[in-house]
Swiss-Prot record:
Keyword terms of this UniProt record: ATP-binding, NAD, Nucleotide-binding, Nucleotidyltransferase, Pyridine nucleotide biosynthesis, Transferase
The enzyme's E.C. designation: 2.7.7.18
Name of the protein in question: Probable nicotinate-nucleotide adenylyltransferase
A GO MF label: ATP binding
Family as reported in the entry's similarity comment: Belongs to the NadD family.
Listed GO biological process terms: NAD biosynthetic process
Catalytic activity, as annotated: nicotinate beta-D-ribonucleotide + ATP + H(+) = deamido-NAD(+) + diphosphate
Domain of life: Bacteria
């Protein structure tokens, strides 16, 4: 039996939406992952304060991944609390599996601003979601580091989806429709608990 391959998708998931689930499923299939763990942030240091509480975001994730047996929630950052740094999360991963951190092209461009980014890149593989047919151009500092350490970026063809959590929050606050943007159980949960109003 080979090494277990695990994808890691960090985010605020405020709220989790269809593009998050589609990216996780695509990564699992394209990279041959045994599991994709969604890692909700406690307090992401480069983002605005979160709107929904950790228990609400965890419950929405549970609802979103129901029916996706290869997707799981890793609550390590919420359990740790405080400022959320990917480097701390990566250092806490148990040994054995091969890990792939899933990034968007926007995250790739600011990756070298992350705390201890070299340590992250040394410990896990980086997989970047790109438009099908497009190539990725990492920042020069990251490209040089990868070349010096004989590492590569894994490209993950993923058609962009016009979905963002901030747009969904604005729509919900305005009472506008979010049809097709949220998994149905998540939309029902948000309505029941009057979130993002």
């Amino acid at each position: 039996m080979g090494v277990t391959r695990i994808g890691l998708l960090g985010g605020s998931f405020d709220p989790v939406h269809v593009a998050h689930i589609a990216l996780a499923d695509t990564a699992r299939q394209f990279l041959g992952l045994d599991q994709v763990q969604l890692i909700p942030a406690a307090n992401p240091w480069q983002r605005q304060p979160l709107k929904a509480s950790a228990p609400h975001r965890l419950r929405m994730l549970e609802l979103a991944i129901a029916g996706h047996p290869a997707l799981a929630i890793n609550p390590v950052e919420i359990e740790r609390g405080g400022a959320t740094y990917t480097a701390d999360t990566v250092r806490a991963l148990p040994g054995g599996p091969q890990y792939f951190w899933l990034l968007g092209t926007d995250q790739l461009q600011n990756f070298c601003t992350w705390r201890d980014w070299q340590d992250i890149a040394a410990r896990i593989e980086l997989a970047v979601a790109t438009r099908p047919g497009a190539s990725i151009a990492p920042p020069a500092e990251l490209a040089a580091w990868l070349a010096a350490h004989r590492r590569q970026l894994h490209e993950l063809p993923f058609a962009p989806m016009a979905v963002s959590a901030s747009d969904i929050r604005q729509r919900l606050a305005a009472g506008a429709a979010t049809d097709g943007l949220l998994p149905e159980p998540v939309a029902a949960y948000i309505a029941t608990h009057h979130l993002y109003r």
